[in-house]
Each structure stands twice: as structure tokens, then as C-alpha cells.
């Protein structure tokens, strides 16, 4: 069996690697579901998948914060010229 190690110890996923991490998670799931792995390898692969999921979650949270900040900055710069989005939809300009 080939053992894979996570070379990214920073806990974050670079933008270009997000899709690669998701693909690796899917591959890990397939290997585990195949039933052909030894139990120790299953645990190692599962631990890797959890680590990748956490990295992807951190990446998505960071991007959401960036988007929120950009929207806030845009709204502050343009004042009420841009309709603000609420949970119900678009609020009319005041």
C-alpha cells in the first residue's frame, strides 16, 4: 500500500489546491469504501480526510470573510447608490 502524507502543514489550502483537496477527499472515501484497505490504513486515510476537510472549511470561511468585507467596503464607498441585500431579498434604495 502507498501511504500518503499531507505535505501542507500550514492548515490552509491555497486557492488552486481547494479542488485538489476535494478530489483527494473523494479518492480517500472511495478507497475506504472499497473494503480493500487494512484497518490501520483506513484510520490513517480517515484522519487525512478529516484534516483536508478542516483545511477546506478554513479556506471557505476565509473567502467568505473576504467577500463580506468587499461587499461592506463597496456599500460604504457607494452609500445608498447600491441596493443592499437582506435575508428577504433586495431592499429598496432610501
Swiss-Prot record:
Where does the record say this protein resides? Cytoplasm
Provide the top EC class: hydrolase
What GO molecular functions are on record for this protein?
exodeoxyribonuclease VII activity
EC number(s) per entry: 3.1.11.6
**Mainly resides where?**
cytoplasm
Query: What is catalyzed by this enzyme?
Result: Exonucleolytic cleavage in either 5'- to 3'- or 3'- to 5'-direction to yield nucleoside 5'-phosphates
Q: Name one GO cellular component term.
A: exodeoxyribonuclease VII complex
NCBIfam families linked: xseB (TIGR01280)
The protein's job, in short, is: Bidirectionally degrades single-stranded DNA into large acid-insoluble oligonucleotides, which are then degraded further into small acid-soluble oligonucleotides.
What's the name of the protein? Exodeoxyribonuclease 7 small subunit
Annotated gene = xseB
Amino acid at each position: 500500500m502507498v501511504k500518503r502524507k499531507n505535505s501542507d502543514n500550514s492548515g490552509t489550502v491555497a486557492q488552486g489546491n481547494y479542488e485538489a483537496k476535494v478530489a483527494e477527499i473523494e479518492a480517500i472515501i472511495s478507497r475506504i469504501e472499497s473494503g480493500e484497505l487494512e484497518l490501520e490504513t483506513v484510520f490513517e486515510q480517515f484522519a487525512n480526510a478529516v484534516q483536508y476537510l478542516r483545511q477546506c472549511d478554513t479556506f471557505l470561511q476565509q473567502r467568505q470573510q473576504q467577500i463580506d468585507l468587499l461587499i461592506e467596503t463597496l456599500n460604504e464607498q457607494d452609500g445608498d447608490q447600491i441596493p443592499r441585500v437582506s435575508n428577504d431579498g433586495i431592499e429598496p434604495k432610501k
